[in-house]
Amino acid sequence: MHTVCETHAFRAAAQAAGMDDDELEELVELLGANPMAGDVMQGTGGCRKLRFARKGMGKSKGYRTITLYSGERMPVFLLTVFGKGQKVNLSKAERNQLKKVVDQIVDAYAQKAPLVGEVK
């Protein structure tokens, strides 16, 4: 099971999209078991877009979650989420902004996470 981290932006977006705690827990379990779920989004630095079903509905009417998984040494980051009715795809400007966020996360995490077997 892989660690999953929720960003503040994700929490705010999840509330705006109407995602409840049970749905969030299900999403975390899914990503913990399969951190590479979803399709890689070009121009985002490795973000993935995962279609996730709303309670009582299918994936086609569900959520679009944007996640980052950058390898075994890092957790899966929940970056944002939106309902299909809110938006279908991200604009080029939004993808560029995600790339900047990804770079900041990877840089910050790399400075704090020792290599496996490294002694501090």
Which residues are covered by each model-predicted region?
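A generic structural signal for short beta-strands and their flanking turns/coil linkers
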Residues: 6, 27, 44-48
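Short, well-structured alpha-helical segments
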Residues: 24-28, 32
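Basic/aromatic recognition patch in beta-strand/loop cores that engages polyanionic ligands
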Residues: 38-81, 86
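Amphipathic alpha-helical transducer elements in NTP-driven molecular machines
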Residues: 21-24, 60, 95, 99
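Arg/Lys-rich, positively charged N-terminal/basic patches that mediate binding to nucleic acids
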Residues: 1-22, 117-120
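Enriched for short, Lys/Arg-rich terminal
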Residues: 69-120
